UniProtKB/Swiss-Prot annotation:
Reactions catalysed according to its record: L-cysteinyl-[protein] + hexadecanoyl-CoA = S-hexadecanoyl-L-cysteinyl-[protein] + CoA
PANTHER family with a match to the protein in the record: ANKYRIN REPEAT AND LEM DOMAIN-CONTAINING PROTEIN 2 (PTHR12349), PALMITOYLTRANSFERASE ZDHHC5 (PTHR12349:SF3)
Keywords from the UniProt entry: Acyltransferase, Cell membrane, Lipoprotein, Membrane, Methylation, Palmitate, Phosphoprotein, Transferase, Transmembrane, Transmembrane helix
Name of the featured protein: Palmitoyltransferase ZDHHC5
Length: 715
């Protein structure tokens, strides 16, 4: 019956099993409805219980014999039997317990049938230990369901006998009421039970003999072991126990399962990227921040379409939108070298094309993925306007970076007024008219020098040609920066070495002498340039030591008098070490500085300012305080930390990376205030005081460094 599910439906096959089920269930129901109530009163209440248990047992075995797999062998494939070119033989002989048993070839199932296996003509399947095909259960009886068929026969025989016997007993108790309904129904059930008892009892007896002898109905009918020895028998008791107590035989056919539809994607396909925001974790010189930007699906089409066996694509164009300072400086040099900007930039690594812009603020504005793929001439020519405004808006700013403006922190490019030597103590700063005018002159020199010098053009050349070599440091006459310095009208270049922290700011000192007094008009916004500290050689370190000796031996330089009109211009001058005591932030910086272990009793040696004994107070300056120790550190580090408007994140971002060895050599030479020498903001001396000493005399060689920085090597 299980094998017929996939074939054409035949109603005639279900007539015998349906009749058997109706007679079984119908007769038993009538018996329980009309006969059992009287028997429970007159005979015993156990009569209905016994008949109920027997009926359930019959029904269970009937169901198992009908719906259970008898042990069907699966059919072989069409080419499985093609062992040789010729046709397979019809029989094969095997030996079982010393007896030759013949196996027949099944043309339908295309394999040799195992011993005791036969092909059912009704089910059209080969069944293991085939017994017969029973129409009353509409299923073949084989090895797997023979036990339930045998128990069905036994239980059915007992149930029929019970129904017939208890029915007869009920009639005997109501012999005077034979015309009654209960007695009439009971006699009808007895007739049906008696009618089925003869064949069922006969069939049960026959199978009892077969089980005792260890044979099947097929073997018994066909007479395979007639007159011979049965190799499959193990004795009467073993045969009975094998049928009733052995473990169930394995199933050879898999249960039919519903096919599931599974969508399989090739491994080279990536999941679709939605136009959502992608959070990127970045590291910016110790600053951890999150960047939220929109990334479109089209931005990943190029990388997804490339395969390993395809030819490599041409190098991508550099994304100069990340280097705002480089774009500005290249734009300033377009008048001298326009060929560098007219053509596309040279190839850069592929990672820069698909690399997002980094920011230290999570609230930065998102830029499109493909913005500013080329460096346009129009964008670069717009930058001098902001530089021109920087001469009218004085401010102090830390060393610039190459971050684009759109990806910069909102507080990164702001101007913060502070006193470089007082570590953020605004009450101890000095406002000097002479110092104010002198500082404005240095700030104005950015515009004049930035448009004529070729230092930024050398930065572009270094970007294209690689890092600066050692020979270029020793032969500064070959660099374009040296020619631009010689072409200038400066007769007396300053003496000494300019730190790479002062990128292209030597012009501020020269222009300050020619433009000492300028009125500020507003805040400044200067474009940054990169800072590199990893290219100092031994010759440069030696020049630092030689320059320090020259500073100690150089005579004082006269300083201009104060301008009373500029006393309250708003720019704070740099006080001497004896004007105001340092705040606690300087002591914090001394812990980080390698030279912070200077004894407190040792005064600081001024580099670009007047000595401690020669410095006077400016207009409105406070009383001199105790002399602060020289911490050997640039004041831009300590002054930034104490500013209330500058956060800790900005302080870390503004500090450039410096190796301990180079930091010691640079900071023993001179101190600087936020990227400016101390001489730019020093207070003017009072009347009667000797002039300041300034190391601006002697021969000097100017060499362009890595990232557009300028090196000054004393001769």
């Amino acid at each position: 019956m299980p094998a017929e599910s996939g074939k054409r439906f035949k109603p005639s096959k279900y007539v015998p099993v349906s009749a058997a089920a109706i007679f079984l269930v119908g007769a038993t129901t009538l018996f329980f409805a009309f006969t059992c109530p009287g028997l429970s009163l007159y005979v015993s209440p156990a009569v209905p219980i016994y008949n109920a248990i027997m009926f359930l047992f019959v029904l269970a075995n009937f169901s198992m014999a009908t719906f259970m797999d008898p042990g069907i062998f699966p059919r072989a494939e069409e080419d499985e039997d093609k062992e040789d070119d010729f046709r397979a033989p019809l029989y094969k002989t095997v030996e079982i317990k010393g007896i030759q048993v013949r196996m027949k070839w099944c043309a339908t199932c295309r394999f040799y049938r195992p011993p005791r296996c036969s092909h059912c003509s009704v089910c059209d399947n080969c069944v293991e230990e085939f017994d017969h095909h029973c129409p009353w259960v509409n299923n073949c009886i084989g090895r797997r369901n023979y036990r339930y068929f045998f128990l069905f026969l036994l239980s059915l025989t007992a149930h029929i006998m019970g129904v017939f016997g208890f029915g007869l007993l009920y009639v005997l108790y109501h012999i005077e009421e034979l015309s009654g309904v209960r007695t009439a129904v009971t006699m009808a059930v007895m007739c049906v039970a008696g009618l089925f008892f003869i064949p069922v009892a006969g069939l049960t007896g026959f199978h009892v003999v077969l089980v005792a002898r260890g044979r099947t109905t097929n073997e018994q009918v066909t007479g395979k072991f007639r007159g011979g020895v049965n190799p499959f028998t193990n004795g009467c008791c073993n045969n009975v126990s094998r049928v009733l107590c052995s473990s169930p035989a394995p199933r050879y056919l898999g249960r039919p399962k519903k096919e599931k539809t599974i969508v399989i994607r090739p491994p080279f396909l990536r999941p679709e990227v939605s136009d959502g925001q992608i959070t990127v974790k970045i590291m910016d010189n110790g600053i951890q921040g999150e960047l939220r930007r929109t990334k479109s699906k089209g931005s990943l089409e190029i990388t997804e379409s490339q395969s390993a066996d395809a030819e490599p694509p041409p190098p991508p164009k550099p994304d100069l939108s990340r280097y705002t300072g480089l774009r500005t400086h290249l734009g300033l040099a377009t008048n001298e070298d326009s060929s560098l900007l007219a053509k596309d930039s040279p190839p850069t690594p592929t990672m820069y094309k698909y690399r997002p812009g980094y920011s230290s603020s999570s609230t930065s504005a998102a830029m499109p993925h493909s913005s500013s793929a080329k460096l346009s001439r129009g964008d670069s020519l717009k930058e001098p306007t902001s530089i021109a405004e920087s001469s009218r808006h004085p401010s102090y700013r830390s060393e610039p970076s190459l971050e684009p403006e759109s990806f910069r922190s909102p507080t990164f490019g702001k101007s913060f007024h502070f006193d470089p030597l007082s570590s953020g103590s605004r009450s101890s700063s000095l406002k000097s008219a002479q110092g104010t005018g002198f500082e404005l002159g240095q700030l104005q020199s950015i515009r004049s020098e930035g448009t004529t010098s070729t230092s930024y053009k050398s930065l572009a050349n270094q970007t294209r040609n690689g890092s600066l070599s050692y020979d270029s440091l020793l032969t500064p006459s070959d660099s374009p920066d040296f020619e631009s310095v010689q072409a200038g009208p400066e007769p007396d270049p300053p003496l000494g070495y300019t730190s790479p922290f002062l990128s292209a700011r030597l012009a501020q000192q020269r222009e300050a002498e020619r433009h000492p007094r300028l009125v500020p008009t507003g805040p400044t916004h200067r474009e940054p340039s990169p800072v590199r500290y990893d290219n100092l050689s031994r010759h440069i370190v030696a020049s630092l030591q030689e320059r320090e000796k020259l500073l100690r031996q150089s005579p004082p330089l006269p300083v201009r008098e104060e301008e009373p009109g500029l006393g309250d211009s708003g720019i704070q001058s740099t006080p001497g070490s004896g004007h105001a005591p340092r705040t606690s932030s300087s002591s914090d910086d001394s812990k980080r500085s390698p030279l912070g272990k200077t004894p407190l009793g040792r005064p600081a040696v001024p580099r670009f300012g007047k000595p401690d004994g020669l410095r006077g107070r400016g207009v409105g300056s406070p009383e001199p305080g105790p002399t602060a120790p020289y911490l050997g550190r640039s004041m831009s580090y300590s002054s930034q930390k104490a500013q209330p408007g500058v956060s800790e994140t900005e302080e870390v971002a503004l500090q450039p990376l410096l190796t301990p060895k180079d930091e010691v050599q640079l900071k023993t030479t001179y101190s600087k205030s936020n990227g400016q020498p101390k001489s730019l903001g020093s207070a003017s001396p009072g009347p009667g005081q000797p002039p300041l000493s300034s190391p601006t005399r002697g021969g000097v060689k100017k060499v362009s460094g890595v990232g557009g920085t300028t090196y000054e090597i004393s001769v």
